[in-house]
Curated annotation (Swiss-Prot):
UniProt cross-references to PROSITE patterns, sorted A to Z: ATP_GRASP, SUCCINYL_COA_LIG_3
Catalytic activity: succinate + ATP + CoA = succinyl-CoA + ADP + phosphate; GTP + succinate + CoA = succinyl-CoA + GDP + phosphate
KW Lipoprotein (keyword) present: no
Keywords per UniProt: ATP-binding, Ligase, Magnesium, Metal-binding, Nucleotide-binding, Tricarboxylic acid cycle
Lineage of origin: Bacteria, Bacillati, Bacillota, Bacilli, Bacillales
Biochemical pathway: Carbohydrate metabolism; tricarboxylic acid cycle; succinate from succinyl-CoA (ligase route): step 1/1
Obligatory cofactor(s): Mg(2+)
Gene Ontology MF term list: ATP binding; magnesium ion binding; succinate-CoA ligase (ADP-forming) activity; succinate-CoA ligase (GDP-forming) activity
Family statement: Belongs to the succinate/malate CoA ligase beta subunit family.
Broad enzyme group: ligase
Gene that encodes the chain: sucC
Protein name: Succinate--CoA ligase [ADP-forming] subunit beta
Source organism of this protein record: Staphylococcus aureus (strain MRSA252)
Amino acid sequence: MNIHEYQGKEIFRSMGVAVPEGRVAFTAEEAVEKAKELNSDVYVVKAQIHAGGRGKAGGVKITKSLSEVETYAKELLGKTLVTHQTGPEGKEIKRLYIEEGCAIQKEYYVGFVIDRATDQVTLMASEEGGTEIEEVAAKTPEKIFKETIDPVIGLSPFQARRIAFNINIPKESVNKAAKFLLALYNVFIEKDCSIVEINPLVTTADGDVLALDAKINFDDNALFRHKDVVELRDLEEEDPKEIEASKHDLSYIALDGDIGCMVNGAGLAMATMDTINHFGGNPANFLDAGGSATREKVTEAFKIILGDENVKGIFVNIFGGIMKCDVIAEGIVEAVKEVDLTLPLVVRLEGTNVELGKKILKDSGLAIEPAATMAEGAQKIVKLVKEA
């Protein structure tokens, strides 16, 4: 689950992570009133959407004038902002964050992530702040420093100071930076985050260390422990199909291809998408039906996939372990009938009760193309979509 920058900064502030003063506004008039409350000489007007790259896309404005705060607010509110993370369709700006400006001395990058190679939380930092960390990693990887964190001990003060020294935080601000990083790590752990990222972290002319940005992603599996976090969810920022999928315990992510995918298991889903790409196709989605799919769940999965008007064919790739192939087959048959499917459909089943599942599909009399392997299924659906 993602949240807005201003919500992230409220969490930071409540847990001892230093941030500039700021207020959220939903109208141009409110933006001016919130700016007045800051009692600052410099104002930063920031578009609030669930995507990075806002500054480069024109979604961040700096001014010393209250009248310009109003002008910028009117310009941004209601505008569709397109960044490298939104896709070409962009996202509509429905709220702004009005923040006090600060005398920036230097910009840095810091982030806590889960390193899948070590299965531990890792602190990443660089003195190349304000730019995409992926670019830094590609062009100057030697400028990224990492600290692997022992889950029993947590982030140690010496690790925080070492990172501060490595990214050339001024000596007079090293202790403040270490305190900042320790507080930020506490946010990551206490709120069950999957990512906590600040780009940029800045040092100021006064020697302060502040978070000028706040990106927080939460582990969806732990949200039951954080009712306060769930209340921050902005459904308007999410794909309606993803929202509908979550209601049925389906993991769905929309992509920009034309071949719908329904798979059980995240690993198999990614392998399926890679195989489709390998044979010249483009997946329209990631959809993990999980290990406990019912007939009803399969039907909902089909409806969600078909909610994407770009879909020209569907590939179902199921390995029946906990999930039995005959149950899936029955669900597929019911779903095809209920949604009156006219698009090409390829189904590959393997595992528990696979022969019974194949018989159910064959006896249905429906236009369902069987496949014995994932590769065969991917080839078939790519061919059928291209011929359609």
